[in-house]
Amino acid sequence: MQLPFGEWLPDQPNHLKQGANIAKNVYHAKQSYKPVKSLVPYSSNNIGSVCLGAGSFRDGSNNVFNFAASSTDIFQLASATFTSRKGSLTGDSTDYFTFTQFGNYVIVSNGVDAPQYYLMGTSTNFADLSAIATEGTPPTFKVSGVIRDFLVTGNQSSNTNRVQWSGINDITTWESGTKQSDLQDLPGSGGQIVHI
């Protein structure tokens, strides 16, 4: 038996409203609402310490890659098991990780250690991004994102209000003026860059 509930209308005035004010733990379905199911553990395995960042990415062949990071390691989750793909990191419990996908690359940084890359479908372990740099050296940064065809980084260890971007559609180029790669220090007292 289905019980009819009014449409969820939280923004409408209460006077003569025929809709619902509250819709907790449900999602909209055809002419009804369905309950959101309880969370269930995917795996009893864990990374062994506090997770400081995680990301899930899909490559060009639709394969999914799941990663999580602690202060000392970057792990890959596959078949319900975490496997270290990079160890010997030197950050502490306040150095959170940023995971960014650029094409089939996953770029990881915490602002302390050299930024890391993983080529989905090819790499076994993470490696320093500088290992594939052909022009210039990638900065050490806390935050990154993709804007159009550029990997954009910010909050560098040497300058917290600096943004720097790779060459156009090329994360191997970091030399200013080459393939449109460049950097910009943001003037004023706006503080450090916290997100891109």
State what each model feature region is.
Residues 120-145:
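Asp-box/WD-like beta-propeller blade repeats and closely related beta-sheet repeat scaffolds
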Residues 71-72, 111-113, 120-121, 156:
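An acidic- and aromatic-residue-enriched active-site/binding cleft used to recognize and process polar
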Residues 82-84, 115, 122-126, 183:
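Predominantly a core beta-strand signature of beta-propeller blades
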Residues 1-82, 136-196:
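N-terminal beta-propeller domains
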Residues 92-115:
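Elongated alpha-helical scaffolds
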Residues 69, 77, 101, 109, ...:
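Generic beta-strand structural signal
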Residues 76, 84, 108-109, 117, ...:
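Short hydrophobic/aromatic-rich beta-strand segments that constitute the beta-sheet cores
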Residues 84-88, 127-132, 175-179:
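Beta-propeller fold detector
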